[in-house]
């Protein structure tokens, strides 16, 4: 199970050891780290991180993960978690995302796969998740209406039921 950058990581893990993965869950993610139509480019995020600092960047980006932005119930959880990183680690994470491309590997993923996406996601657009769904042969896309990037926090009951039903 992987969310956002974690979704890239689980795709890579499946590439390296797919025979050890029974089922794969990718949510709020796509096949490319350098996300087209993201709320801002990765380079813009890196530049703003250097200028605005970690605290402001974590707050600003976490707002994009929720439909209700900083008024969302679990916004503070995400904003505070982002502020626990170092400036260097945050920049390295952005570079890693920018440079990762798993598109060519999707045809090799044979594992039963659940793809979850919030239709208000500003990081990963519909094309990204449609590509996952089309290129992974045994996949199913579930769209959460009225949710953004953090569907697991915006509609946790439905998210947990969806994951549980897929795993059982």
Which residues are covered by each model-predicted region?
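Active-site-adjacent alpha-helix of alpha/beta-hydrolase-fold enzymes
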Residues: 130-139
């Amino acid at each position: 199970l992987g969310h956002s950058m974690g979704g890239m990581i689980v795709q890579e893990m499946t590439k390296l050891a797919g025979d050890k993965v029974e089922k794969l869950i990718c949510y709020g993610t796509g096949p490319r780290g350098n996300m087209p139509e993201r709320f801002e480019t990765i380079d813009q995020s890196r530049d703003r991180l250097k200028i605005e600092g970690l605290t402001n960047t974590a707050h600003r980006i976490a707002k994009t993960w929720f439909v209700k932005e900083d008024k969302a119930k679990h916004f503070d959880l995400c904003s505070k978690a982002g502020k626990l990183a170092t400036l260097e680690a945050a920049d390295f994470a952005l570079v890693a995302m920018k440079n990762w491309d798993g598109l060519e590997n999707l045809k090799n993923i044979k594992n039963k796969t659940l793809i979850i996406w919030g239709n208000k996601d500003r990081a990963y657009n519909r094309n990204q998740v449609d590509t996952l769904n089309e290129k992974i042969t045994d996949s199913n896309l579930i769209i959460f209406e009225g949710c953004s990037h953090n569907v697991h926090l915006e509609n946790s009951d439905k998210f947990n039921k969806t994951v549980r039903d897929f795993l059982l």
